[in-house]
Curated annotation (Swiss-Prot):
<feature type="region of interest" description="Disordered">
    <location>
        <begin position="539"/>
        <end position="573"/>
    </location>
</feature>
<keyword id="KW-0067">ATP-binding</keyword>
<feature type="region of interest" description="Disordered">
    <location>
        <begin position="204"/>
        <end position="229"/>
    </location>
</feature>
<feature type="compositionally biased region" description="Low complexity">
    <location>
        <begin position="149"/>
        <end position="169"/>
    </location>
</feature>
<dbReference type="GO" id="GO:0043327">
    <property type="term" value="P:chemotaxis to cAMP"/>
</dbReference>
<dbReference type="GO" id="GO:0031252">
    <property type="term" value="C:cell leading edge"/>
</dbReference>
<dbReference type="GO" id="GO:0004708">
    <property type="term" value="F:MAP kinase kinase activity"/>
</dbReference>
<dbReference type="GO" id="GO:0005524">
    <property type="term" value="F:ATP binding"/>
</dbReference>
<feature type="binding site">
    <location>
        <position position="321"/>
    </location>
    <ligand>
        <name>ATP</name>
    </ligand>
</feature>
<dbReference type="GO" id="GO:0005737">
    <property type="term" value="C:cytoplasm"/>
</dbReference>
<feature type="region of interest" description="Disordered">
    <location>
        <begin position="105"/>
        <end position="169"/>
    </location>
</feature>
<feature type="compositionally biased region" description="Low complexity">
    <location>
        <begin position="539"/>
        <end position="569"/>
    </location>
</feature>
<keyword id="KW-0963">Cytoplasm</keyword>
<dbReference type="GO" id="GO:0016020">
    <property type="term" value="C:membrane"/>
</dbReference>
<keyword id="KW-0832">Ubl conjugation</keyword>
<comment type="similarity">
    <text>Belongs to the protein kinase superfamily. STE Ser/Thr protein kinase family. MAP kinase kinase subfamily.</text>
</comment>
<feature type="compositionally biased region" description="Low complexity">
    <location>
        <begin position="1"/>
        <end position="57"/>
    </location>
</feature>
Length: 660
């Protein structure tokens, strides 16, 4: 019901705001008393630009009490430690070091639209990203006033003022922005939940009022669930409680909607079925260096080191990525890119991001600890991975790719064995988003050349544009390598021919010249460093490349480039940085020969000892033409994936744990 009111607002010199309101009808009185009894409207609009709008648009609250507008800034536990998730929206920019620590320079909340902020969810690490980011929901967030308002016509008028309020709070050093108006919609229903988080910006204790207001107004928003599970969402004290998150999952499963994130008309709903696999952790905890006990080093990379750390407060282990600031510019950009990606990503088959902070001259990123390590680590112990286990891993990774491609429009661009991690439960998750890229929509193409070159698709190596289908090639090559225990190219595997005539001719040549092949293999083993290449054409450029005979096995080209390629790194032609070429270059095969082989030669296939379903899966992934590769969503319907998607890997993981 609309009610015309004229509200006069006076602000005293002491900073106290007295609101005088005229008489309104009884219905509006009840609504205002139930929802605005803590007078948060006055506390939220503490700036001169809002005073004029309050005269015309403010909701009438009949009270004669003075409200203290003093803003209290939470005390930092460690003056030298700053959380990255409270420094502003993650927009295009780079690292900036100042007296406040590590900040993100670029577009700030003041200059960004509401829709841009919606994509990044809340920026406070204490807000559970899993509850705010359901794969089956479409979120809409608005940093409005700190109270629930039944008169929705006033929200539009005060929208700009509310945004200014939020910016003023952030500029004053307040860490937790207020959040209200979370709208979750599905194809069959649309519900709005108006929730306000704890408002500690004033001296009033509004916490109990906040919960009471929400509980009294959200009774109709249960998604047809038998119990009021979503009311637990409003309980701030129990925000990290596992039961609350399970209730949220039950809320999803009780919905009658069949939301398919991949494509319309598909019968698969894998994203919803796996919601219970989210890692449960208390996001109210502070991941500060003083609370972490470093156990050991898990791995090292170009930008830093990953350590196993024990969080004493929660009694949990985390993987702590430590990056020093004395690093190359391209590594700095990768750090920001990974932080932006991790912050907006929450899915069972993506490695969870807990927090990030800057202290002691380094950036610390707290991630989910995966006990069994990467697929590369596993292959070092077991040589190969059984087919049923690979089927289960493919099922899990494909779900992660569907989420990245369809939900976030994101290309990982570096799918390989070392970037797929496994925990003790046998759950495989995608990690390392340092070179990921976002496309505007599913039909977009990328043209940059970043990632591990040996796992790139032929179109990427050739310098052509690429899209999500390039990840299918990388996944197929990864699964194939795990099955045979070595990189497929140069491993004497049979190759799939596109034309039957060429296949017959090659088979005849192999039968007629077995001795010559053996001699060539012996020569390659005896003289792996003396392979001379002439007129090798890569990316339609005529480059004369030959391998020099030295102890470092460096390849020098004739383009006056003095770059040393030690079979580990190759120049990134997109931004001048280094791109890891991987450790999968077969012994005796030059790096450029390998790339030429991937582009020009036929693709490898699985031996006949594997099942026909597995061989078909690899064959469909390793199609030279991108348009002939199935999408990640389509591959979830493949017979190989369906065959092993429910396979129990506990016995396999138990054997691996014994070998550690």
């Amino acid at each position: 019901m609309n009610t015309n009111t004229n509200t006069n607002t006076n602000i005293s010199s002491s900073g106290n705001n007295i609101i005088n309101t005229p008489t309104t009808n009884n219905n509006n009185k009840n609504n205002n008393n139930n929802n605005n009894n803590n007078n948060n409207s006055n506390n939220s609009n503490n700036n001169s630009s809002n005073n004029n709008n309050n005269n015309n648009n403010a909701v009438g609250v009949k009270t004669g009490k003075k409200v203290n507008l003093k803003v209290e800034t939470p005390v930092q536990n460690n003056e030298n430690s700053y959380s990255l998730t409270t420094s502003g929206t993650f927009k295009e920019g780079d690292l900036l070091i100042n007296k406040k620590g590590l900040l993100i320079k670029g577009e700030s909340p003041k200059n960004s639209s509401v829709n841009d902020r919606n994509k990044n969810k809340s920026l406070h690490s204490n807000l559970n990203p899993q509850l705010l980011a359901s794969p089956t929901s479409s979120e809409s967030m608005d940093f409005n006033q700190g109270f629930y308002n039944n008169n929705n016509n006033n929200n539009n008028n005060n929208n700009n003022n509310n945004l200014n309020n939020f910016n003023n709070l952030m500029n004053n050093g307040i860490d937790s922005p207020q959040l209200s108006g979370i709208s979750i919609s599905t194809p069959t229903s649309s519900h709005s939940f108006n929730n306000t988080f704890t408002n500690y910006y004033n001296n009033n204790n509004n916490y109990n009022n906040y919960n009471n207001n929400n509980n009294s107004n959200n009774n109709n928003n249960n998604y047809n669930n038998s119990n009021n599970n979503f009311n637990n969402f409003n309980n701030y004290n129990n925000y990290g409680n596992n039961n609350n998150f399970n209730n949220f999952n039950a809320l999803q499963s009780s919905s009658n909607s069949s939301f398919d994130i991949s494509s319309s008309g598909s019968s698969n709903n894998y994203l919803n079925n796996s919601a219970n696999n989210h890692p449960h952790y208390d996001t109210n905890l502070s991941y500060d260096l003083k609370d972490l006990k470093i156990i050991r080093v898990l791995g090292r990379g170009a930008g830093g080191v990953v350590k196993l750390a024990y969080h004493e407060t929660s009694g949990t282990y985390i993987a702590l990525k430590v990056i020093t600031l004395d690093i190359q510019e391209n590594i700095r950009k990768q750090i920001i890119l990974e932080l932006k990606t991790l912050h907006k990503t929450s899915y069972p088959y993506i490695v969870s991001f807990y927090d990030a902070f800057y202290t002691e001259g380094s950036i610390f990123i707290a991630l989910e600890f995966m006990e069994l390590g990467s697929l590369s680590d596993i292959m070092k112990k077991t040589s190969t991975i059984p087919e049923p286990v690979l089927g289960k891993i493919a099922f899990q990774v494909l779900q992660g790719l569907v989420y990245l491609h369809r939900k976030l429009h994101l290309i990982h661009r570096d799918i390989k064995p070392s970037n797929i991690l496994v925990n003790n439960k046998g759950e495989a998750k995608i990690a390392d988003f340092g070179v990921s890229g976002q496309l505007q929509h599913t039909l977009s193409k990328a043209v940059t050349w970043v990632g591990t070159v040996t796992y790139m698709s032929p179109e990427r190596i050739s310098g052509r544009s690429y899209s999500f289908d390039s990840e299918i090639w990388s996944l197929g090559l990864t699964i194939l390598e795990c099955a045979i225990g070595k990189f497929p190219y140069g491993s004497n595997l049979p190759h799939q021919q596109q034309q039957p005539l060429q296949q017959q001719q090659q088979q005849q040549q192999q039968q007629q010249q077995p001795l010559q092949q053996q001699q060539q293999q012996q020569q390659q083993q005896q003289q792996p460093l003396q392979l001379q290449l002439q007129n090798l054409d890569i990316n339609n450029s005529n480059n004369n490349i030959r391998n020099s005979n030295n102890n470092n096995n460096n390849n020098n080209n004739n383009n006056n480039n003095n770059n040393n390629n030690n079979n580990n790194n190759v120049l990134d032609i997109s931004n001048g940085g280094l791109v890891d070429s991987g450790s999968s270059v077969p012994e005796g095969m030059g790096f450029w020969v390998l790339l030429d082989c991937i582009v020009k030669e036929e693709v490898p296939i699985l031996p006949s000892t594997f099942s026909k379903e597995f061989r078909s899966f690899i064959s469909e992934c390793l199609q030279k033409e991108p348009t002939e590769r199935p999408t990640a969503s389509n591959l979830l319907n493949h017979e190989f994936v369906k065959k092993y998607q429910n396979f129990n890997v506990e016995k396999w993981t138990a054997n691996l744990k014994q070998q550690q």
